[in-house]
């Protein structure tokens, strides 16, 4: 395992620890999730490039599409919660029942 792989895995781990520590605010959780997705994208891209498996070239792009969808839904929830309650606490997500 190269130094680049170790750094990316460490970045993913730090993002996961940040997500577990700062889970009370939605904005902090979304930032940690975005950094996790970015490190997964870089790791997937490096893995595909190192393996020379041409059929898997689309996998990092699909991961980016899912990351963009996750970010859009998360920001929509953040705007909805902050407009309704004035804060971005995750505990307010339980109050959004339809």
Curated annotation (Swiss-Prot):
One of its GO terms (cellular component) is respiratory chain complex I. InterPro entries: NADH_UbQ_OxRdtase_chain4L/K, NUOK/Mnh_C1-like. It comes from Caperea marginata (Pigmy right whale). The chain crosses the membrane at residues 1-21, 29-49, 61-81. This is NADH-ubiquinone oxidoreductase chain 4L. Its main location: mitochondrion. It is a multi-pass membrane protein. It comes from the Eukaryota. Core subunit of respiratory chain NADH dehydrogenase (Complex I) which is composed of 45 different subunits. It is found in: Mitochondrion inner membrane. It catalyses: a ubiquinone + NADH + 5 H(+)(in) = a ubiquinol + NAD(+) + 4 H(+)(out). Its EC number is 7.1.1.2. One of its GO terms (biological process) is ATP synthesis coupled electron transport. GO terms for molecular function: NADH dehydrogenase (ubiquinone) activity. Core subunit of the mitochondrial membrane respiratory chain NADH dehydrogenase (Complex I) which catalyzes electron transfer from NADH through the respiratory chain, using ubiquinone as an electron acceptor. Part of the enzyme membrane arm which is embedded in the lipid bilayer and involved in proton translocation. Signal peptide: none annotated. The keyword Heme does not apply. Keywords: Electron transport, Membrane, Mitochondrion, Mitochondrion inner membrane, NAD, Respiratory chain, Translocase, Transmembrane, Transmembrane helix, Transport, Ubiquinone. The keyword Metal-binding does not apply.
């Amino acid at each position: 395992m190269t130094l680049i792989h170790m750094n990316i895995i460490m970045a993913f781990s730090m993002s996961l620890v940040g997500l577990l520590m700062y889970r009370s605010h939605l904005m902090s959780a979304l930032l940690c999730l975005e950094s996790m997705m970015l490190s997964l994208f870089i790791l997937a891209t490096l893995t595909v490039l190192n393996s020379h498996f041409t059929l898997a070239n689309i996998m990092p792009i699909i991961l980016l599409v899912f990351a963009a969808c996750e970010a859009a839904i998360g920001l929509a929830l953040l705007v909805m919660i902050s407009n309704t309650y004035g804060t971005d606490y995750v505990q307010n997500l339980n109050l959004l029942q339809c």
